[in-house]
Design a protein with these regions (language model features):
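Elongated, mostly alpha-helical coiled-coil "stalk/stator" tethers of large membrane protein machines
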Residues: 1-184
Length: 184
């Protein structure tokens, strides 16, 4: 992550947090809007290209942003997009959003867990996993799922800098390694 993204994402977080002290819930509103805009920019890279195009006058680009957002995001997010556009950093919005998310999660005792499995988990398995990870980390858990058939069975979980590999693939790799050592 670039220094610019850390500075801008951090500044937005601090400003929203300060405003949250005055109006309860504002930080959460800003977080939700930043995540939404980040997802929109990732899914529609033409938006970012449009906002970066120097051939279109800045006023027209900003007017288009204001029209598109039309009061649907908190003022701080609208102003943040405007600032990044004016300074030519709008292509770093997603990185800024990542920094904002890190700070928001730290502030609210949330850990993000990446879960890799061969097949989708059932609701019961998701609940049990979330409960177990909460017990391990002491934090509220946000789960991100990835399906990878090469896992074969079980799970690989990355949370708080730790990797928990309880996959069948790992067991087979360990067995293969053990068999290779005993064959020599």
């Amino acid at each position: 992550m670039s220094t610019i993204s850390k500075e801008y994402g951090g500044a937005l977080f601090l400003a929203a947090k300060e405003e949250d002290n005055a109006s309860d819930g504002y930080l959460k509103q800003v977080f939700d809007a930043v995540m939404l805009c980040s997802r929109l920019f990732k899914e529609n890279p033409l938006y970012v290209s449009f906002l970066k195009t120097p051939d279109i006058p800045l006023e027209d680009r900003l007017a288009a942003v204001h029209d598109a957002l039309n009061g649907r995001v908190p003022e701080y997010v609208d102003n943040f997009i405007e600032l990044l556009t004016e300074r030519g950093y709008i292509d770093r919005f997603s990185e800024c959003a990542d920094e904002f998310k890190l700070l928001y999660y730290a502030e609210n005792g949330i850990a993000e867990a990446e879960v890799v499995s061969a097949v989708p988990l059932t609701d019961g398995e998701v609940h049990a996993l979330r409960t177990k990870l909460k017990k391990i980390t002491g934090k509220r858990i946000e789960l991100l799922f990835e399906i990878d058939p090469s896992v074969i069975g079980g799970l690989i979980v990355r949370v708080d800098g730790r990797v928990i590999d309880a996959s069948v693939r790992k067991d087979l790799d360990n067995l293969r390694e053990l068999m290779g050592k005993t064959a020599h």
